[in-house]
Amino acid sequence: MTLRLAEHRDLEAVVAIYNSTIASRMVTADTEPVTPEDRMEWFSGHTESRPLYVAEDENGNVAAWISFETFYGRPAYNKTAEVSIYIDEACRGKGVGSYLLQEALRIAPNLGIRSLMAFIFGHNKPSLKLFEKHGFAEWGLFPGIAEMDGKRYDLKILGRELS
């Protein structure tokens, strides 16, 4: 696996990986697939201090991605970021998530980040386990906040102090 900053040419692969998680109702609150055009503003909104990275497999294909995003958009929160990790279906369960989260924890202090947060559905046990394994703790809970297919789901906020 090779990690590098995302480039415009990666947008379709990033969106395809994102869309592959929608049907499970475990990862994102989007309920229908999105297009690269739908995600262009989000993609372009990544900056030097809040970047988007892609992980390439040995064949140079985008296998996963990590996004650092501004939390809440107020100056007092500038040292806090939300981290998101998305992994291609073929690469799940193979340690890619651990690799990406370790890289995120390594990179974040260089971006001026002191606190990392992740928003994870309460029923997404694999993601909760991954983040907890890497020192994240539950910082908050929004009970029943998401409704998909007539069912309500909790959203957990996990966080970790880096310094």
From Swiss-Prot:
Acetyl-CoA binds at residues 85-87, 94-98, 124-126. Residues 1-158 form the N-acetyltransferase domain. InterPro entries: Acyl_CoA_acyltransferase (IPR016181), GNAT_dom (IPR000182). This enzyme is an effector of phosphinothricin tripeptide (PTT or bialaphos) resistance. Inactivates PTT by transfer of an acetyl group. Keywords: Acyltransferase, Antibiotic resistance, Herbicide resistance, Transferase. The keyword Nucleotide-binding does not apply. Its EC number is 2.3.1.183. It holds the Pfam family Acetyltransf_1. One of its GO terms (biological process) is response to herbicide. It catalyses: phosphinothricin + acetyl-CoA = N-acetylphosphinothricin + CoA + H(+). GO terms for molecular function: acyltransferase activity, transferring groups other than amino-acyl groups; phosphinothricin N-acetyltransferase activity. It comes from Bacillus subtilis (strain 168). This is Putative phosphinothricin acetyltransferase YwnH. Belongs to the acetyltransferase family. PAT/BAR subfamily.
